[in-house]
Amino acid sequence: AARRAKLKEFGADVALDSRSPDWVEEARKATGGRGVDLIVDQISGYVANANMQAAAVRGRIVNVGRLGGMKGEFDFDLHALKRIDYIGVTFRTRSVEEIREINRLMRADLLLAVETGALRLPVDSVYPFADADAAFARMRANAHFGKIVLSL
């Protein structure tokens, strides 16, 4: 609950807990029954079908993480009925040139918003490089909200 409240401080209109059995219904309610236009999925695995249930017709799901597992159930019929764009993303198979182009585009799209404060990026804590073990312990404990920074 505390993390969801913090998300609202950073501009989220609605913050849902994907572990709640009611989150799909809450997402649909928050969108007037239409469903979510864009889901950025860092969990994958066991939430794949729930994401599609929460998505709008012609919605988009971008899978950027696999914290919930590499495999899971996938309702191909629901995917087709809603005409969902399901996009997988990784940097592991990209060339250096592709990564540079993505960084260039990201800067063009986001840098001004960050500089003006329209987009705020939470930094949870800053550790000297010598205390990297403590930083990793904080991350493993999932006690942070935002980025953990190592300074040199």
Model-derived features with residue positions:
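Adenosine-nucleotide cofactor-binding segment
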Residues: 1-47, 99-101
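Short catalytic-loop micro-motif centered on adjacent basic/acidic residues
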Residues: 37-40, 60-64, 121-124
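Glycine-rich phosphate-binding loop and adjacent beta-alpha segment
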Residues: 46-118, 151-152
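C-terminal capping/lid region of NAD(P)-dependent oxidoreductase domains
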Residues: 111, 116-125, 133-152
